[in-house]
Amino acid sequence: MSFNPDYESVAKAFIQHYYSKFDVGDGMSRAQGLSDLYDPENSYMTFEGQQAKGRDGILQKFTTLGFTKIQRAITVIDSQPLYDGSIQVMVLGQLKTDEDPINPFSQVFILRPNNQGSYFIGNEIFRLDLHNN
């Protein structure tokens, strides 16, 4: 395989789609909306230090998140093509859930090509950017 020359447009379209499905009111709707983006066995996620593997493990994590209202502002989306046709995506932004204060966040994705000519999330890391004072 080779580098995907359309990596930036793919990354931006993916992020718009992902957050439109993630930023819904309940965990079950969130999991249902995102299920097609994960591979049954070959997807990995670290969410605030907690790891999950495979579609079912990741979607289970999404159903247990305690918030119902999400407001998100994306500051920047950076992306790079990887040698095997994958795309690395990094998102920086701000996030407000329920009545919690606004917090900065970072999220990284590795989008892997699948056999249908599109992508699945191979790897994902999410962190609120909280610093000890």
UniProtKB/Swiss-Prot annotation:
Residues 10-128 form the NTF2 domain. SUPFAM superfamilies: NTF2-like. One of its GO terms (cellular component) is cytoplasm. InterPro entries: NTF2, NTF2-like_dom_sf, NTF2_dom, Nuclear_transport_factor_2_euk. Keywords: Cytoplasm, Protein transport, Transport. It is found in: Cytoplasm. GO terms for molecular function: nuclear import signal receptor activity. Coiled coil: none annotated. One of its GO terms (biological process) is protein import into nucleus. CDD domains: NTF2. Facilitates protein transport into the nucleus. Could be part of a multicomponent system of cytosolic factors that assemble at the pore complex during nuclear import. This is Probable nuclear transport factor 2. It comes from Caenorhabditis elegans. The gene is ran-4.
